[in-house]
Amino acid sequence: MSGWREDDTGLHRRFVFADFAEAWAFMSKVAVLAEEHDHHPDWSNSWNTVDITLISHDKRCVTERDRRLAAAIDAL
């Protein structure tokens, strides 16, 4: 999982794109993955930047579900 940082609050990664349209297209793809994995990110978007945090809130820690979704996001 290249570029992800893990700490007590989750797996974190910032994605930077050329413009808002590219960032939005990426978020749309991640949304489909999240539905397929039945696991949804905490995220924010500001113009060309998307910040994603993955954590299993029910377990209060990073789990394999988070790592699998991070790997799927990396594969986009």
Where are these regions (language model features)?
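Short, well-ordered beta-strand elements within core beta-sheets of diverse protein domains
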Residues: 10-18
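Short aromatic-glycine-(Arg/Gly/Cys) micro-motifs in beta-strand/loop hairpins
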Residues: 1-10
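Short amphipathic alpha-helix segments
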Residues: 24-30
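C-terminal structural segments of small proteins and small subunits
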Residues: 48-76
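A short N-terminal helical cap/helix-turn-helix that marks the beginning
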Residues: 34-45, 75-76
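Short Gly/Ser/Thr- and Asp/Glu-enriched loop/turn motifs at secondary-structure junctions
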Residues: 8, 45-49
